[in-house]
From Swiss-Prot:
Subcellular localization, as worded in the UniProt entry: Mitochondrion inner membrane; Mitochondrion intermembrane space
Record's protein name: Cytochrome oxidase assembly factor 4
Lineage summary: Eukaryota, Fungi, Dikarya, Ascomycota, Saccharomycotina
Keywords linked to the UniProt accession: Disulfide bond, Membrane, Mitochondrion, Mitochondrion inner membrane, Repeat
Disulfide bond residue pairs: 39-69, 49-59
Domain notes: The twin Cx9C motifs are involved in the recognition by the mitochondrial MIA40-ERV1 disulfide relay system and the subsequent transfer of disulfide bonds by dithiol/disulfide exchange reactions to the newly imported protein.
Family indicated by similarity: Belongs to the COA4 family.
Motif (Cx9C motif 2): 59-69
Miscellaneous comment text of the record: Present with 907 molecules/cell in log phase SD medium.
């Protein structure tokens, strides 16, 4: 049976590592940048899953958690990307 969401082993491991990072008096630049997105745990859970499985297809639950967090925290507005049709993510949001 596949674990989902915040009960996945990767999420639990990422949460423990995040607690350690928060206690670090001198976090590295990467940890700081990811923390500012509000999705540090979800990002790390996705990375841990891929590192262990070597297959993104086995990380759909972690990917869904990360995407949900990313959108919930307004990170699409932080990063402008170009979609296949040539519009930016900001253009897509204006159409909604």
């Amino acid at each position: 049976m596949s674990e989902t969401g915040e009960t996945s082993e990767y999420y639990k491991q990422a949460l423990e590592e995040y607690k350690e990072v928060q206690e670090d008096e001198d976090p590295d630049v990467w940890d700081t940048r990811i923390s500012k997105t509000g999705c540090y745990v979800e990002n790390l859970a996705l990375q841990l899953c891929h590192a262990e499985t070597g297959d993104w297809r086995q990380c759909f639950n972690e990917m869904a958690l990360f995407r949900k967090c990313w959108e919930k925290n307004g990170n699409r507005e932080r990063v402008s990307t170009v979609d296949v049709d040539g519009t930016t993510s900001k253009d897509s949001e204006k159409k909604k």
